[in-house]
Amino acid sequence: MTPALLYWNHVCILHNQEKNFLEGLTARLREEGIALEVRYFGLGYPEHMSEYLARPDAVLPDLIVSADLEVFEDSRIFKKLERDLYPAATWLPLRQGPALDSVRRGTRLLPFLSIPLVYYTKDTSHCAGKRLSELKGLAFGGINNSAGKTLVKAVWSRYGRGAALSLLESGAVSDMPIGAFQQVRLGQSPTALVPSLYALRADGERSFLRRPAEGPLLIPSYFCARNSIPEGAARRIAAEILCPELCDFYVENGDLILYPSCTTGHSRQEGARYFTPAPEWYETVSAEEFYALYGAMLPTAHIP
């Protein structure tokens, strides 16, 4: 029996279904001689994956599926993993296009999906056709997950540190994106940046979905595998996770953008433009510099 330890920190609003899928996968793989063990992180669990992996005594997994992007973006964490990673991005055919181009990160990280964030508003004049850097009083959420952090990083990357500071100073920031959605629904904020799954609740008469001028902000997730597990077993698990059943489920139930070519489903937010931090931004702004600003403006942020 080949043991395989998978760390999972993925789509929290669909987690019950994810867990059911993985329990079934674990049973199927056992029949093939692979003993898959899944450890979950994120909402509903004691800590996020990046918080655990940042600890000096953290046990490294064989496999990772994560939308907690600090695992890959904080060099202090990723350096623990990167030298042992297989070129998993070459293992499965992917759907080519501007969304994939926006989230590629070399050969070691296999893009799985992206959560598109868009405007939800009751006042289209406040946000229609406007850049994220232009909005004052924007509601957004995810202080300790990638939704909030990626927004700040993307604005900093394109418009500068001052724009990121202004966003944090004027924004109405909630613990989670659903909190930002509720602020607009209750009339406490004019516009929120939320996962499109929430914004699709807009009725088109009193509430509306609009896209930022930059395009939807993408929160991607990745699969990666360390050479602590035989490559054949890692490839088998990758193919079983990034499969039509789970990919189609994510599209149909989450309006998510999927990258494996095994699915024919499409998010309603797919288009020609997307907003992500520029790759070179990570080379010029350290994790320490980012968190110095982020933590100073958001006292409840967990600073590694």
Regions found by a protein language model. Name each.
Residues 24-30, 119-126, 131-174:
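Ligand-binding cleft/hinge of the Venus flytrap
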Residues 48-52, 179-183, 234:
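Short, hydrophobic alpha-helical packing/hinge segments within bilobed ligand-binding/sensory domains
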Residues 57-58, 109-113, 185-186, 216-217, ...:
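Extracellular/periplasmic catalytic domains that process cell-envelope and extracellular macromolecules
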Residues 117-125, 218-232, 249-253:
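A bilobed periplasmic-binding-protein/Venus flytrap-type ligand-binding module shared by bacterial periplasmic
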Residues 232, 240-304:
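Extracellular/periplasmic juxtamembrane helices and adjacent flexible linkers that interface
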